[in-house]
Design a protein with these regions (language model features):
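RNA-binding accessory domains that recognize and position tRNA/RNA substrates
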Residues: 1-80, 91-93, 108
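Cysteine-nucleophile active-site neighborhood
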Residues: 78, 82-128
Length: 128
């Protein structure tokens, strides 16, 4: 995996609003989330995100906008997020970091909460 940027291959090509408001409950299967009010807006940078992570954000009544792994900070900030999520994904964080680290550095300057999982967390660590 060394030097492989696989995130670019699996990332969304277009920005989209996550609209699947169904929640998985082991006992019931998918059920509709009855609380329609969205409290926080999270922008998820897609390095290969799993849909279940997006479902969990919905469970917590977050509005979630998913953007490409190469979306620049200026365009992310135009979405007026309350926080930034750096997703999981395949590949070498150093290779993906070549374009991701400058974006994350620009986002950090705006004092927004930024958090990640797996590859996203590794890229955040490289950024800091």
């Amino acid at each position: 995996m060394k030097n492989l940027d696989l995130a670019e291959k699996v990332s969304t090509k277009k920005t989209y609003l996550w609209k699947d408001l169904k929640t998985w409950k082991k006992e019931n299967g998918f059920i509709k989330n009855k609380n329609k009010k969205k409290n926080l807006h999270v922008v998820a940078i897609d390095y290969g995100i799993k849909k279940n992570i997006l479902r969990y954000f919905s469970d917590f009544n977050c509005k979630v906008t998913v953007v490409s792994c190469k979306t620049v900070a200026k365009d992310i900030l135009k979405l007026k997020p309350n926080g930034i999520f750096l997703s999981n994904g395949p590949g070498d964080p150093a290779a993906t970091g070549k374009y991701a680290i400058p974006i994350i550095k620009d986002l950090i300057k705006n004092n927004l909460p930024i958090f990640g999982i797996c590859l996203g967390h590794q890229i955040l660590a490289l950024t800091l």
